[in-house]
UniProtKB/Swiss-Prot annotation:
Residues 13-138 form the RNase III domain. InterPro entries: dsRBD_dom (IPR014720), RNase_III (IPR011907), RNase_III_dom (IPR000999), RNase_III_sf (IPR036389). It catalyses: Endonucleolytic cleavage to 5'-phosphomonoester. It comes from Anaplasma phagocytophilum (strain HZ). This is Ribonuclease 3. Digests double-stranded RNA. Involved in the processing of primary rRNA transcript to yield the immediate precursors to the large and small rRNAs (23S and 16S). Processes some mRNAs, and tRNAs when they are encoded in the rRNA operon. Processes pre-crRNA and tracrRNA of type II CRISPR loci if present in the organism. It is found in: Cytoplasm. Its EC number is 3.1.26.3. GO terms for molecular function: double-stranded RNA binding; metal ion binding; ribonuclease III activity; rRNA binding. The gene is rnc. Its main location: cytoplasm. PANTHER family: RIBONUCLEASE 3 (PTHR11207:SF0), RIBONUCLEASE III (PTHR11207).
Amino acid sequence: MEPYSEDSILALTEKVFKISGYRFQDHELLKTAVTHPSIAAERYASYERLEFLGDAVLGLVVSEMLYTLFPDDSEGLLTKKRIALVRGSKVVEIAQSLNLGNILLMSKGELTSGGISNNSNLENALEALIGAIYVDGGLESVRHFILQHWKPLATNLADTPLQDAKTALQEWAQGHNFAIPSYRLINKSGLEHAPVFTVEVTVNGQRVHATGCKKKYAEIAAAKLMLEKVTKQNDP
């Protein structure tokens, strides 16, 4: 369809209402929220700025939700749960459940290459939609949308193991545009039947080390320590 005809934007407004439960008042904002950079480069503004905002709004609302749902959890455990809930794969999972790719406006080239099902596109677009709902309707409107989709995931966290610390640290690093963490075995001690491995992990120039009875366990322990360190430094 012609992306920005009067009829098409009304149809788009209805589609977004059906998947989000929110009806946009600002149609220009909605257009921007569903415009992929590939078509924006040709004629229009894209969702990238809204994506930036939506990422922060999602983190805020999920943090608030976890603070309320788990009053006995420590700061460290709440941080782990937040990372598990806002990591890219979870955002993509929700975007897929909403069929969000079907309403995105993108170039023919992007469409032909599978853009509507591309995980990166879906993650970015959902964060942009969150940012747009926040701008158009305020915190209460976007809180309602986020809780509708993230609260069931949060309540299931108690019944499932939290994300492996190495994976969580890697996604944290990538989310901050850092190189992926590197691990180095710096010592092996102990008896032959009971070795102790010491592994150092490096992220953005910062290093910590930890030990374990297996190299794998030492890496996980080091990742956990690093994750606690960097989230305290960089998260509000």
